[in-house]
A protein has these predicted regions:
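Internal intein/HINT superfamily modules and their associated LAGLIDADG
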Residues: 1-263, 269-287
């Protein structure tokens, strides 16, 4: 078992900034009797745990099969470390115990160099962010970050707006569960802005959650002049065009794929782009 040697006392690398953001989202620290840090993600994201452990080998890897107790649960992998020094270093960098409860209003953006902030935000996005895909319009995306701390999201919003990544106003999110926690969400629904967010998050990235990056990479803007777009189902460019419709989110073009015979709608990039203006009403698949 490797000893923790104050590696996270100063956040001065891409990997440390990413890990700090991920811990802000998905980690927890406790100070009762033993000083512990644990972050856990599901089996589909095991590779990220392996990547983090390779970069920070002082952590202990754990595996737990929650399916023994709930058939709908999956195997989960986690990183854990009992260390007072690690607890103190994370605390000094803004990680609080009970950060989703009584300390949620204490959570703030850490004081990092600008060149590291994108990696911190990417880490937080990989923990508590998602990309929503419309089932009816599979080329449409909405990116969002959730938190119980509205103040923390306001700080993310202010920072990203200062570099030209504009979002809708922060809103309360319907949880659809018995949880008493109130969630807030900052979201990006404009096509050009989503691509700008992607470029910001992944520039010089060395570590990330692959499935979320893949969703960003799969998003393409359909221009009005593109008469033969890629089919979002079979990925071929062999489509026939149909009607043009003015929808609540912009101009929609209907196509039929000659290969798979499926029909789909794609939004043209127009000046009055208002993609998914009413997200609560849209039929989406979060990832």
């Amino acid at each position: 078992m490797r000893k923790y040697n104050r590696e996270l006392q100063i956040i001065d690398t891409i990997e440390k900034a990413y890990l700090l953001g991920f811990i802000y989202a998905d980690g927890c620290i406790t100070e009762k009797t033993k000083y512990q840090l644990r972050t856990r993600i599901s089996i589909v994201d095991e590779q990220l745990i392996l990547d983090l452990h390779k970069e920070f080998p002082f952590f202990n890897k754990e595996r737990f099969d929650f399916g023994k107790y709930n058939k709908n649960s999956k195997i989960q992998y986690s990183l854990r470390k009992t260390s007072k020094e690690l607890y103190n270093d994370l605390y000094s960098n803004g990680v609080y115990p009970r950060k989703s409860g009584e300390n949620k209003d204490k959570v703030n953006l850490p004081k990092l160099n600008d060149e590291l902030m994108s990696h911190f935000i990417r880490g937080f996005f990989d923990g508590d962010g998602s990309i929503n895909i419309s089932k009816n319009r599979p080329n449409l995306r909405r990116a969002e970050i959730c938190s119980v701390s509205e103040n923390f999201l306001l700080q993310i919003q202010t920072y990203l707006r200062s570099i030209g990544i504009i979002n809708k106003e922060i809103r309360a999110k319907k949880t659809g569960s018995k949880s008493k926690l109130q969630l807030f969400v900052v979201e990006w629904i404009n096509s050009e802005t989503i691509l700008k967010l992607k470029d910001y998050l992944y520039k010089n990235a060395t570590i990330f959650l692959k499935r979320k990056k893949d969703l960003f990479d799969s998003f393409k803007i359909v221009r009005a002049e593109d008469k033969n777009p890629e089919c979002p189902y079979c990925k071929t460019k062999s489509c026939t065009s149909g009607a043009t419709r003015k929808m609540k989110y912009g101009i929609a073009y209907r196509y039929k794929c000659k290969k798979c015979n499926k029909r789909f709608t794609q939004k043209a990039q127009v000046k009055s782009d208002k993609l998914l203006e009413n997200p609560e009403e849209d039929n989406q698949q979060p990832s």
